[in-house]
Amino acid sequence: MTESLEMGKSIDFNVQTFDFKSAQFYLDRAYANAPFIHCLTNNTTKFFVANALLAIGAKPAMVESWQEVVEFSQRAANVVMNLDSLTDERLRSLSMSAQVAHDHGKWWVFDPAAVSDILSYRSGFARELLRYYPRVIRGNASEISYLNDTYGRRSFENVMSSSEAIEAAVKLAIHQRAVVVVTGEIDYVTDGETILAVRGGHPFLGRVCGTGCVLSAMIASTVLCGDVLYGAASACALMKRAGERAGLTTSGLGSFYVALLDNLTFPMRYQD
């Protein structure tokens, strides 16, 4: 299904709906690869991220010591880098990993967590990492808009809907030669030409710590299906479907967390 979405007064975007049924082909291919994913992610969510990757058939490594990141990033099928939990050592590790990925022509996924004009140190570092051209950039609407210089984000929280950031996502994708994923009530995935909309999910997805970090790591695995755009959208579709199903059987955030991981697990995602 294709819809027309008007942004501002001059730009009219054609947005294609991408659903879970469409994602299954790409998820199968990604699962069969059993890729080794090097994760430099949020310290608060490492356990969740690692288990989610195992659930979808990937092999995670959570190593972030600067003495080891080069070797791990060189050998990984893909690398995901998250700006949460910044320390001097993590900054060094992120820089080294991004550079080795770029120098070796390796893909990597960038999660620019909490970039804003009030966090100049973090945000300046994020722009430095963009010089190493991540293959995928995943963030909420405010983060993506900030990276594209279309919105000065003055809050630690996302204050925009994902649809408000489509134009910024398209421009950022073109400038960075990347696939950009804007997550929200509707996820939008674009390579600068095609725009895919992924609907569904559950309100608890935004209230459980780590779902964004998990999605970024899942994208690092699913894009290895052979098509970066549709692979990234497939990770979004899987997360939305898992959230929907988890919400049917749970009454609070604790049980939802467990049920979400259950519903990410292959091949349970195929059950109706």
Curated annotation (Swiss-Prot):
Binding site for substrate: M62, G210
Reactions this protein catalyses: 5-(2-hydroxyethyl)-4-methylthiazole + ATP = 4-methyl-5-(2-phosphooxyethyl)-thiazole + ADP + H(+)
Family: Belongs to the Thz kinase family.
CDD domains per the UniProt record, alphabetical: THZ_kinase
Recorded metabolic or biological pathway in which this protein acts: Cofactor biosynthesis; thiamine diphosphate biosynthesis; 4-methyl-5-(2-phosphoethyl)-thiazole from 5-(2-hydroxyethyl)-4-methylthiazole: step 1/1
Residues given in the record as ATP binding sites: R138, T183
Summary of the function given for this chain in its UniProt record: Catalyzes the phosphorylation of the hydroxyl group of 4-methyl-5-beta-hydroxyethylthiazole (THZ).
GO BP, sorted A to Z: thiamine biosynthetic process; thiamine diphosphate biosynthetic process
Cofactor: Mg(2+)
InterPro entries: Hyethyz_kinase, Ribokinase-like
Protein name, per record: Hydroxyethylthiazole kinase
EC number: 2.7.1.50
Any one Gene Ontology molecular-function term assigned to this protein's record: ATP binding
Keywords from the UniProt entry: ATP-binding, Kinase, Magnesium, Metal-binding, Nucleotide-binding, Thiamine biosynthesis, Transferase
HAMAP family listed in its UniProt record: Thz_kinase
Gene name of the record: thiM
